[in-house]
């Protein structure tokens, strides 16, 4: 007689388990990626060694890894904030783009005459406002009309991308560089609006991103308002019974999530890109932020090292092409990491066991004693 597996809630998972599962998820993804590379005729150890050297083997490699990680920290925070409330904001990509649009727009409007101490904060704040405004397009219907935020935020990504392309390729907007006539490109923002660099093209955006992630962690984990948010995320019915205004909390967190992604767009424009350039901004950083949040277990501080890991993977793409390995290998690894991270989250929340065997009782005929 076959015994069916029993899936039961684990309860509160230990800190060791929460650390071990993401590590094992990454290792499992590397094993699967290694099998794929071996099938295609590549030596997995050589490929992974090249990736590691490209990401951390030189000063330029470390700088490029941290540059790639900067927006991922904030798009990871954006996803983690929303998902903690069981709000499925899949629109980080569109909010990132609209943050870049708002940030570059305010930089161009202020012009080179504005001092850096005015221009840089204005650019960053404008990026957050842009992301929040774009998130509100999905947040308000979700809260007050009960619409499905997965569909609306996903569709808004493509609208934001088309809007950015229109500003540069399909119009004579202020965002388009009038000095370039051969192929349209974004107007460079003034130097006074750019983030100061301090190491091999690496700018202070990495510190701003880390500070914002820590601030989000403190807000959610250490304040009375954050406690109410966590209650809503655990049980909306319990929160309503306790007198918490659930709809208001969901709306605010949704807007904060969009603002975090918008900050990422602002830092990318004011940092390595320096303009609203669709070719440099359409990188799927909002979608990668979902992987970062999932692998971090929605922990807002764990997002930081995970974003650096993903930045290292992104940075390794060009290095792989130099040895004949397709750069799509990086995308495959990111997808494998996401799959194993989601599976790992299941095992954090649940345990699987076999049912216990019940003793079999045998009735003996009258007058017959068991041997």
Which residues make up each language-model segment?
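Cytosolic-side transmembrane-helix boundaries in multi-pass membrane proteins
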Residues: 1-28, 34-38, 234, 241-248, ...
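Helix-loop-helix "hairpin" substructures at the membrane interface of multi-pass membrane proteins
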Residues: 133, 199-276, 300-305, 371
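Transmembrane alpha-helical segments in multi-pass inner-membrane proteins
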Residues: 255, 261, 265-335
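Hydrophobic core segments of alpha-helical transmembrane domains in multi-pass membrane transport
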Residues: 22-37, 75-80, 100-106, 127-131, ...
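Short loop segments and helix-boundary regions at transmembrane helix junctions
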Residues: 9-20, 83-92, 113-184, 219-224, ...
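Transmembrane helix-bundle core of multi-pass membrane transporters
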Residues: 59, 153, 157-222, 275-276, ...
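Single transmembrane alpha-helix segments in multi-pass membrane proteins
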Residues: 35-40, 50, 55-110, 124-150, ...
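Membrane-interfacial amphipathic/re-entrant helices at transmembrane-helix boundaries
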Residues: 2-75, 117-118, 122
């Amino acid at each position: 007689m076959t015994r069916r597996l029993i899936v039961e809630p684990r309860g509160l998972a230990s800190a060791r388990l929460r650390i071990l599962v993401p590590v094992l998820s990454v290792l499992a993804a590397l094993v699967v990626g290694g099998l794929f590379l071996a099938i295609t005729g590549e030596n997995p150890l050589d490929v992974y060694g090249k990736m590691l050297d490209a990401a951390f083997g030189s000063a330029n490699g470390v700088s490029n890894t941290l540059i790639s990680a900067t927006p991922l920290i904030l798009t990871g925070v954006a996803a983690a904030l929303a998902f903690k409330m069981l709000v499925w904001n899949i629109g980080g990509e569109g909010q990132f783009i609209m943050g870049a649009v708002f940030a570059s727009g305010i930089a161009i409007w202020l012009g080179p005459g504005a001092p850096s101490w005015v221009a840089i904060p204005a650019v960053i704040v404008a990026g957050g406002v842009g992301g929040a405004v774009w998130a509100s397009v999905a947040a308000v219907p979700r809260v007050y009309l009960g619409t499905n935020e997965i569909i609306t935020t996903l569709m808004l990504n493509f609208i934001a991308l088309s809007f950015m392309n229109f500003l540069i390729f399909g119009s004579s907007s202020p965002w388009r560089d009038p000095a370039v006539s051969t192929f349209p490109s974004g107007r460079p923002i003034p130097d006074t609006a750019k983030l100061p660099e301090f190491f091999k093209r690496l700018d202070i955006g990495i510190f701003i991103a880390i500070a914002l992630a820590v601030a989000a962690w403190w807000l959610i984990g250490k304040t009375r308002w954050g406690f109410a948010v966590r209650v809503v995320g655990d049980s909306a019915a319990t929160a309503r019974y306790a007198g918490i205004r659930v709809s208001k909390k969901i709306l605010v967190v949704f807007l904060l999530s969009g603002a975090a992604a918008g900050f990422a767009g602002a830092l990318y424009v004011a940092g390595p890109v320096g303009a609203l350039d669709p070719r440099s901004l359409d990188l799927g950083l909002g979608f990668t932020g979902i992987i970062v949040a999932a692998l971090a277990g929605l922990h807002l501080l764990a997002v930081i090292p995970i974003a650096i890991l993903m930045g290292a993977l992104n940075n390794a793409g060009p290095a792989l092409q130099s040895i004949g390995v397709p750069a799509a290998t990086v995308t495959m690894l990111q997808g494998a990491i996401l799959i194993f991270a989601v599976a790992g989250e299941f095992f954090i929340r649940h345990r699987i066991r076999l049912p216990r065997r019940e003793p079999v009782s045998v009735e003996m005929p009258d007058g017959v004693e068991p041997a």
